Structures are given as structure tokens and as C-alpha cells.
Amino acid sequence: MTLTEIQNVEKENAGASVPKHSSNKLKLEKELEKLEIVDQTKAASAEETNNESEVNELDADEPMLQDLDNRFVIFPLKHHDIWNFYKKAVASFWTVEEVDLGKDMNDWEKMNGDEQYFISRILAFFAASDGIVNENLCERFSNEVQVSEARFFYGFQIAIENIHSEMYSKLIETYIRDETERNTLFNAVDEFEFIKKKADWALRWISDKKASFAERLIAFAAVEGIFFSGSFASIFWLKKRGLMPGLTHSNELISRDEGLHRDFACLLYSKLQKKLTQQRIYDIIKDAVAIEQEFLTEALPVDMIGMNCRLMSQYIEFVADHLLVELGCDKLYKSKNPFDFMENISIDGKTNFFEKRVSEYQRPGVMVNEAERQFDLEADF
């Protein structure tokens, strides 16, 4: 029965006695209820379709986002530069078990309350942030990008981000003995407003159905290239002081990984046909810089561990300029790097930290080309 037929029957039965037609009335009401649910579902589906078409229209002609018949097979390679990034990621694979935290507790127990507070909150931020990056990769980027080489990279990045999250969680579990405080740190997004603010900014880009792929790509390049930069620098400051060897070793590995992820985002952006205006990129980057500066100079000031807040603010601007140049834009802040100990740490394009890593950080044989694999009996030994 249609909705109109049901309503007509209801009108006919309106004057009838209740006992005689009560069962029919109940049936009609149930059927009417079902039809209303169906109508609501159809309306919601139509609205969702409209939203999807709006999203698709923004990126409709972007080749990298279009379905490809051969996207399930990697060879023959079509994007050798993207593939090279994937192989670099594989070569740099590491596990939490490789990081020795045995000597850290002596340093931790010698630190004052401010230093312990600062480090624990930085670790809490990192533990949550890697999960947010993965949320974006799983929900959006790896589903949208159809280029096989890029999908390989994203698949491996998800695994690496999981290792980062595990590492930070292990650091918290090792340093923080009080269970209540530990649980508070594991729920940092809900417990600390200054961490929630950064998380909300990143999450907004995941849920924004109207933002173009290019905008979201820039936003997450800012997450990994700006939101992490000051926190990395604060931990490297501890290394300069000869403290926390396990923490600083993991920081070296993770900052190298994130530098690679940031550079990959810039490479992918360079391949997009529909690029953003320089002003739009500036708007996204300025937003991220302001949040990061507030985070490390007001909400969780680095002077708690003996760093200079003004110089940290300058360093964040320097990092932002580096990202802008990689994206093909002019520098916005023109700030110099105030921290000599951060020269070559996944930031300076002249000497990439990935290329300077010690040999044990790289998986053997992964980046070796075919010519180097050949065994020559006439070679000099």
C-alpha cells in the first residue's frame, strides 16, 4: 500500500467503532510508520548523494583522484619519484623494541616538576596526533588517491604511524608510574584544552566534505611539518643537554619519518593539476603556525625546560617558510633558524637528515639498485 492509500483507509475507518477495526488500525499505523522511515531514509540518502556530488565536482578532473583500471597492479611503474619515496619509507622501517629506554629513568627522576610536566604533555600530544594522522589516511587519502605508487606509500605510512603511536605510549608507560596520571595522558585530547585545540584543527580537515583534496593535503602537510616541529625541537634540546638517550633516539627516528611524510605530501601536491592560490596556502599555513606558537609559548611554554619562547616562535616560522618553499610558494616570515642543534634534522633541504642517518637505521639492501646487486668475479677485493 502507498502512503496515500493508507491515509484514505484511515479516513474511512475514522467513524467506525474501535473494537471492530482496532486491529486494522494498528496494522495501518505500523505500515504508516514503516513508510515514514523509508521516506526519511530516502531523503537522507538523497542529501548524502548531493554532498558527494559536491565533493566530486571540486576534484572532478584531477587525474590522481580518478579511477584507474590498473590501480591494483604496481608494475610497470608510472611515477618513479613517488615510488622512490615508498622505497625510502621501507628502508627506514624500525620497531619500538629497537629503542633502549634503560638509561632514561635516571635522568627522568633528576628532572624538576616543570620539566617532567612539559615532557609528559608533549608525549601525550604525540600519542594522540599519530592516531589522527592515521584516521585521515584510512578515511580519506588512501581512498581518494588512485595512483598505485602513492597508495603503496600511504599503506606503509599507516604502519609507521602505528609504530610512532606505540612508541609514545610506551614512553608514557615507562616514565609515568602513577596510573591515574598515566590514564589522563592517554586521554589527552579530552583532558587538556591546549592539546584538544590542535587535535580539533586536524580533525576538522578530515570531516570537511567541501574542502578540496589540495586543501586537505596542505593542511596535513602542516600537521606533520609544523604541528610536530616545535615538539621535536624541544626533545632535541634535551639531547643537546645529554639527557634521556632513549627518548631522544626515538625522536630522531620519528622526526626523520615525519620529514619524509611531509616531503611526500609536497611531492604529491606538485603533481596536482588544480593547485591552490598562494594566498589560500598562506591562510592554511598561518593558521597552523599561530596554533603551534600558542601551544609552545603560552599553553605549554618551552621555558619550562630552559628554552627561549621567543626563539621557539621564530623557529616555527622558519619551519613554515621551509614548507612553503617546498610547496612552490614564496617565504612568508623570512625567519632564520635560531637553533643550531636543529640544522640537518629533517628540515634543512640542503642536507636532509634521512640521507645522513647512520647505517643501522636503514634496512639492508632496500635502496640498492640492480647494478649494485651484481656479483662480479673480476672485481677487486
UniProtKB/Swiss-Prot annotation:
* Name the UniProt record assigns to this protein: Ribonucleoside-diphosphate reductase small chain
Q: Which PANTHER family match?
A: RIBONUCLEOSIDE-DIPHOSPHATE REDUCTASE SMALL CHAIN, RIBONUCLEOSIDE-DIPHOSPHATE REDUCTASE SUBUNIT M2
A GO CC term assigned to this protein in UniProt: cytosol
Required cofactor names: Fe cation
What gene name is listed for this protein? Answer: rnr-2
**N-terminal signal peptide:** none
Matching entries from InterPro entries are given as: Ferritin-like_SF, RNR-like, RNR_small, RNR_small_AS, RNR_small_fam
- Where in this protein does the record put region Disordered? 1-27, 39-59
* Record's cofactor remark: Binds 2 iron ions per subunit.
Query: What are its E.C. numbers?
Result: 1.17.4.1
Give the protein's biological function: Provides the precursors necessary for DNA synthesis. Catalyzes the biosynthesis of deoxyribonucleotides from the corresponding ribonucleotides.
